């Protein structure tokens, strides 16, 4: 028996389309392909030895908890250190509850869209724009208004 699970999807999920970024990244897997796209650092630049040392140290000191799930907002110790750094180096009054650790910019953009965008809201973006942000905002049914750029950045005259 074949079950059509897509009929159970939410309206929002049915509006989603395949990620253009994901499709482009598939091309980077082709043999001999040299990608000049952003977001794919040169693997030779990775500090592999330092990462190995950090992993070894972590397992020596915290072997029972190193692979456990953490809190949704991120490890409290890391958030405390970052809050203190914000206070000391940037004079920003920052507390533990003011910070959330994400796995990257895309997760942060998706969370921001979830919190701030209602269906039908309009957001402004430069042209060109980060495709991942446009897709995250589109998923929450926002309307995009593009603003042209000139040699100094966003063309503010076009906002009038």
Give a label for each model feature.
Residues 2-12:
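Generic N-terminal amphipathic, Lys/Arg-enriched alpha-helix
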Residues 80, 110, 131-135:
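Alpha-helical elements of the RecA-like P-loop NTPase motor core of helicases
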Residues 17-21, 105, 109, 130, ...:
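Amphipathic coiled-coil/heptad-repeat helices and related helical stalk/stem segments
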Residues 117-160:
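PLP-dependent aminotransferase-like
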Residues 14-104:
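N-terminal small-domain helix-loop-helix segment of the aminotransferase-like
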Residues 76, 96-123:
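Conserved beta-loop-alpha segment that forms the PLP phosphate-binding cup at the N-terminus of a helix
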């Amino acid at each position: 028996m074949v079950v059509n699970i897509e009929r159970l999807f939410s309206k929002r999920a049915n509006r989603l389309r395949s990620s253009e970024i994901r499709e482009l990244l598939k091309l980077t897997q082709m043999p001999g392909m040299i990608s000049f796209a952003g977001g794919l650092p040169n693997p030779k630049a990775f500090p592999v030895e330092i990462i190995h040392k950090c992993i070894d140290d972590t397992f020596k000191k915290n072997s029972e908890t190193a692979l456990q799930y953490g809190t949704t907002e991120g490890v409290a110790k890391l958030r405390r250190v970052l809050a203190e750094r914000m206070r000391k180096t940037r004079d920003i009054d920052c507390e533990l509850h003011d910070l959330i650790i994400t796995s990257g910019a895309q997760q942060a953009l998706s969370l921001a869209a979830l919190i701030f965008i209602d269906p039908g809201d309009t957001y402004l973006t430069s042209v060109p724009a980060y495709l991942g942000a446009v897709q995250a905002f589109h998923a929450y049914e926002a309307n995009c208004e593009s603003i042209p750029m000139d040699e100094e950045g966003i063309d503010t005259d076009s906002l009038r």
